[in-house]
């Protein structure tokens, strides 16, 4: 896959906003740069998140290099969603 921005949904690992995906098999992927999207408001489903972004929620700090082994959905992000998600504050405790 290319180095564009994507939303990756995993069965148990959660949801990730990522740039650059390397698929290793049907359900495993290496995310080159990613932020976990722990929760969101302002979008009914991930298909809306990848188009519009979110209005509120919890987006974790960026991680360089992450392997997920339970991928079930990969959605390309539109430019508006990319700008929105890149500018979400980092959720930390």
Regions found by a protein language model. Give the residues of each.
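Conserved RNA-binding domains used in RNP assembly and mRNA/RNA metabolism
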Residues: 2-93
């Amino acid at each position: 896959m290319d180095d564009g921005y994507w939303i990756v949904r995993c069965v148990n690992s959660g949801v990730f906003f990522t740039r650059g995906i390397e698929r290793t098999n049907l359900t495993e992927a290496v995310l080159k740069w990613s932020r976990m999207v722990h929760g969101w408001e302002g979008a009914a489903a991930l298909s809306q998140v990848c188009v519009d972004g979110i209005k509120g929620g919890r987006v974790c700090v960026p991680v360089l290099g992450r392997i997920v082994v339970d991928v079930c959905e990969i959605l390309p992000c539109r430019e508006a969603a990319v700008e929105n998600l890149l500018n979400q504050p980092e959720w930390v405790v």
